[in-house]
């Protein structure tokens, strides 16, 4: 069906009424998720199952950063607003890709070391002439939508903590709502609302209890914190931070004037340390409903009581109406990391149904009467190792899922994996170092696929095997999804049966979700490309680093994309030899401090440098200048003199050189082990 083009309006002219009626103007993409329902479904059908084979690039735009790209752009009246890694923001002409303005918040490179999983950003919000972005360093920034100039900026976290921001803000009735990340590093999660016009704090809601000796927080959460939350914790939880960060999903429900928050994992993971093995630990791994105006608690549903597997519940939600057992129900659909697909009553917070989308060992089922999982003995590895399925990487992570009212199906990228977990008896929190997990872990990956799921029948409709990113559904009967960890492919499939109809190679891997919009009567499909997210790409083929790109497609497009990047340089080991005990000590240093960015066993796709190929590796003094002195701090590689001993720098070089020699000789990688344990090498790329 033909859709009208955009009318001439002031830049960023989006108000509450327009957001509420976003589905009535599919030529725009006004909100993260498309509408307040987050369906990521567009009524545009100019591109459809008949003509999608003629889809070609219309334009592309190169960012100034080579790190991971996870943002979903916002398109308002022919202007695209998109954030990139390092929290930078571009305004582009949505028809041509021409840059209108650019904003760099100048996040310090040292803040990159606080991020668990790359310096990514998942998007902006546009409201009343402003563009809002959460910066990695914790600032919430309002920009003039016409010029990109700063209107106001406020710090939302303790800048001395390990908290960061990677999620997109949500604007609701004149307030900008933002969460934060950092649960793997011992922080206390909270969500804050700020006046969109002034940046003044309106309310704050803490998601786990703080130090009881310090008294109330003076926050919207105070009453429910003492009445309901704190009694579910035990032991010295306050000294560990607790976790529960809301690093991604914040939804608004106009039917009830509520926001829904997806909360994160515990800090540390192991409840033996976090809470003396007692209590449910509210509000970890929960969906929490709050009054949008005041931040007051309304209800919660906890998907993982006494969380122990990094099964956070921050993943995307979809708000919809479904016909269930003869009744029209207002529901919230959620597929968190724990492997189950939940359908929850939005009004009451009660569970309607839940079923596993992948093999699960941590729970056999979810009891509908109580809403609680039915767990086996030793699920929390209290009596020895436990093989958790899915593993700590989760079955469905931050990647967007979509819902088509046309097919009645939800579409989500899913992965089967497993983790062997056991208590680490030597655990102690270490600042800026390893994840504060309290576990020893091994990990294995299995099948990955795009899953079409019937939320009413709670069963699979179909699957297509491959590892992919976020999903977009359209009225043209199509699904769009990106693939690839270093170089990529953008594909279109039939929404009814998953049959692939079209694909286009991209020089960058793709993680983000696409959006679609119309300018001048022409429908476009656009996606931000560029893989990253730390060690998640550790097993991928290493290539030369390249900038991320926004790529827009249209029927009969004429643009030519750049060619794929060349292979990365060869292994570059130091002359050596190094004593084996020195290599072993260096392996321990690497596992504790380096792998979360540079990959397990020193294997990296080179989005973040593959150290085995580093030009600094053969030169002892050059290596020391970078790793000890911080010569590359502006790029995010801090100097580790505050956390390591001087001799450990050379031990680290010995280990990386050992791995480089194995690569050069065609041998399989394998981190040296010291004793009977290895530190956690969890691939938990999410925040």
For each predicted feature, which ranges?
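Blade/loop signatures of beta-propeller domains
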Residues: 4-57, 214-224, 372-376, 439-440, ...
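Repeat-blade elements of multi-bladed beta-propeller folds
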Residues: 29-33, 68-88, 113-139, 164-185, ...
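Extracytoplasmic beta-rich repeat domains
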Residues: 61-72, 102-125, 153-168, 206-249, ...
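Short loop/turn segments that connect beta-strands within beta-propeller blades
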Residues: 93-96, 144-147, 196-198, 292-294, ...
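Blade-level signature of beta-propeller repeat domains, shared across WD40, Kelch, NHL, RCC1
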Residues: 515-567
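His/Cys-centered metal/cofactor-coordination and adjacent catalytic loops
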Residues: 560-582, 595-614
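Flexible coil segments in periplasmic/lumen-exposed cytochrome c-class electron-transfer proteins
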Residues: 565-593, 635-687
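Gly/Gly-Pro-rich "capping" loops immediately C-terminal to redox-active cysteine motifs
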Residues: 587, 599-629, 636-640
């Amino acid at each position: 069906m033909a859709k009208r083009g955009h009318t001439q309006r002031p830049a960023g002219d989006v108000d509450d009424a327009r957001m509420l009626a976003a589905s009535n103007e599919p030529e725009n993409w006004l909100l993260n998720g498309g509408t307040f329902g987050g369906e990521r479904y567009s009524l545009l059908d100019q591109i459809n199952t008949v003509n999608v084979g003629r889809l070609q690039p219309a334009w592309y735009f190169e960012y100034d950063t080579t790190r991971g790209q996870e943002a979903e752009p916002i398109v308002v009246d022919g202007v695209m607003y998109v954030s990139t890694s390092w929290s930078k923001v571009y305004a582009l002409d949505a028809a041509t890709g021409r840059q209108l303005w650019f904003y760099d918040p100048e996040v310090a490179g040292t803040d990159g070391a606080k991020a668990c999983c790359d310096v990514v950003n998942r998007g902006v919000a546009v409201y009343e002439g402003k563009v809002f972005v959460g910066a990695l360093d914790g600032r919430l920034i309002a920009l003039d939508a016409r010029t990109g100039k700063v209107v106001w900026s406020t710090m939302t976290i303790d800048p001395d903590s390990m908290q960061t921001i990677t999620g997109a803000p949500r604007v609701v009735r004149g307030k900008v709502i933002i969460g934060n990340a950092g649960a793997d590093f011992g922080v206390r999660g909270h969500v804050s609302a700020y006046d969109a016009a002034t940046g003044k704090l309106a309310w704050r809601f803490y998601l786990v209890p703080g130090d009881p000796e310090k008294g109330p927080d003076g926050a919207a959460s105070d009453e429910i914190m003492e009445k309901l939350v704190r009694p579910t914790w035990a032991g010295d939880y306050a000294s560990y931070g607790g976790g529960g960060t809301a690093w991604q999903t914040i939804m608004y429900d106009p039917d009830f004037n509520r926001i829904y928050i997806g909360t994160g994992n515990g800090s540390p993971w192991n409840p033996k340390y976090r809470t003396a093995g007692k209590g449910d630990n509210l509000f970890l791994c929960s969906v929490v409903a709050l009054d949008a105006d005041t931040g007051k608690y309304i209800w919660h549903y906890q998907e993982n009581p006494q969380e122990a597997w990094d099964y956070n519940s921050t993943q995307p939600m979809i708000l919809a109406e479904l016909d269930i057992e003869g009744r029209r129900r207002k529901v919230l659909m959620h597929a968190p990391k724990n492997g189950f697909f939940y359908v929850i009553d939005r009004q009451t917070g009660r569970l309607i149904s839940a079923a596993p989308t992948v093999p699960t060992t941590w729970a056999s089922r979810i009891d509908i009467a109580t809403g609680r999982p039915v767990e086996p003995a030793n699920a929390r590895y209290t009596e020895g190792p436990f093989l958790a399925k899915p593993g700590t990487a989760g079955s469905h992570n931050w990647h967007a899922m979509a819902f088509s009212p046309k097919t009645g199906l939800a579409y989500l990228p899913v992965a089967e994996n497993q983790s062997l977990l056991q208590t680490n008896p030597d655990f102690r929190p270490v600042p800026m170092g390893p994840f504060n997990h309290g576990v020893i872990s091994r990990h294995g990956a299995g099948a990955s696929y795009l899953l079409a799921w019937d939320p009413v029948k709670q069963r699979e409709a179909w699957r297509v095997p491959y590892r992919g990113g976020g999903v977009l559904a359209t009225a043209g009967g199509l699904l769009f999804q990106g693939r690839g960890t270093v170089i990529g492919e953008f594909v279109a499939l039939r929404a009814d049966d998953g049959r692939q109809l079209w694909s286009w190679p991209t020089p960058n891997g793709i993680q983000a979700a696409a959006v679609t919009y119309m300018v001048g009567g022409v429908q476009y499909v656009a996606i931000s490309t560029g893989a990253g997210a730390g060690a998640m790409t550790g097993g991928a083929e290493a290539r030369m680093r390249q900038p991320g790109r926004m790529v827009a497609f249209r029927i009969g497009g004429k643009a030519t994309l750049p060619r794929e990047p060349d292979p990365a340089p060869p292994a570059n080991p130091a002359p050596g030899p190094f004593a084996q005990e020195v290599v072993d000590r260096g392996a321990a240093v690497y596992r504790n401090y380096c792998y979360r960015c540079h990959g397990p066993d020193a294997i990296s796709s080179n989005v973040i440098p593959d150290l085995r190929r580093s030009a600094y590796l053969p030169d002892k003094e050059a290596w020391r200048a970078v790793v000890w002195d911080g010569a590359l701090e502006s790029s995010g590689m801090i100097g580790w003199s505050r956390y390591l001993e001087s001799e450990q720098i050379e031990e680290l070089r010995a280990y990386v050189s050992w791995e480089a020699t194995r690569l050069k000789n065609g041998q399989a990688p394998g981190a040296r082990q010291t004793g009977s344990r290895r530190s956690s090498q969890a691939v938990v790329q999410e925040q």
